[in-house]
Amino acid sequence: MRESVEQRHERILQIVRGHGSMRVTELAAEVGSSLETIRRDVIALAEVGRLRRLHGKVSWPTATLNARDARLARRAPTAESGPLLGMVVPVAGYFYQGVIQGARAAAAAAGTRLLVGITEYSSERFAQQVGNLVRAGADGLLLTPSWEPGGPTGAECEELARLQVPAVLLERRVPVGSLGTQLDRVGSDHAEGAAMAVRHLAGLGHRRIALLLRASHTEPALRLGYAAAMRALELPEDDLRGGGAHPGTGRTEDFEEEFPRLLALIQSGEVRAALVHTDTDAVNLLQRLAAEGIRVPQDFALVSYDDELAAVADVPLTAVAPLKHAVGEAAANQLLLRIADPARQRTHIELLPELKVRDSCGARLASDRGL
């Protein structure tokens, strides 16, 4: 069977990770594809931060740049003449793919470059990537630190406060009163996104709405928004407290431990709607419900938080969709403003997600009407 592009990309990633750094010609020989094909693959993977490329070489994003390559990264010929931006995010796919694309679009529009480092939720790699980008000459940084979901430690806040270049926090918050709160911040209003879903379901007549969440940095805000909306509507909370050990590594079996509780509530007739994060879990829940003979939306209404897979589910899912591209774009623009004027007012920006109504709630509305 012929190897797909995705399979070849995975093989390229495995090879480069094993070597740390290598020439593109060497990579082409090891993969067994033409040099032109591998060059296109490397460009595509570098665009989303999964690889780093420089003057005929390719390296793993977490590999430390030697002094020569760091100088070349700063001095590389380019049509852009603006400041060099650095970006550190946990992963290049899923939520952050759109964020990276938005930041790249803003950088390109401003005539500047964006270098991306990936941490895979490792605090050690986060510190390494920040150092790499600063040594490469980054004039400012877009940062999504690899903190625990509960928030940063005091030491982690101090590290932010000691940064020697302008920085904008991306989809992260420093606790009020802590060091680092003076940094600019751009992110999604996840709490209001959860409340939006609750209001939509309540507007359709639901009075018992379950909440199933996987452990993530988004979880506290989603739980806060859900609880606030349920209280405002004077409805009882049905928070099933799903979760995993760490963002990006939450085990499916931990999340699915809550399914029997949800099933019992459905079968008793008490609960006929749920908000589920992530949309991958919402799609899995849809399949589990179908296996139990529970129809969506006839017997049960389902809203997913996030919109990566929701539209292509067997029953297209109503979803709350964070504006990832817009978040990345706004963060990059904010960083460019900070670099241009270090004394300008500090800004915290939160973008409201969108409610995309499909088939899984039994209603097709143009938008959340504030019910």
Annotate each predicted stretch with a short phrase.
Residues 3-7, 21, 43-114:
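HTH-adjacent hinge/linker in prokaryotic transcriptional regulators
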Residues 11, 95-109, 193-196, 217-236, ...:
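Short, solvent-exposed amphipathic alpha-helices that sit
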Residues 107-118, 211, 227-258:
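Short beta-strand elements in bilobed, periplasmic/extracellular small-molecule ligand-binding domains
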Residues 146-195, 280, 306-317:
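Flexible loop/hinge segments that line or gate small-molecule binding clefts
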Residues 174-176, 181-211, 221, 255-263, ...:
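Hydrophobic alpha-helical segments within soluble ligand-binding/sensing domains
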Residues 195-235, 347-360:
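An alpha-beta-alpha
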Residues 263-371:
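Flexible loop/turn connectors
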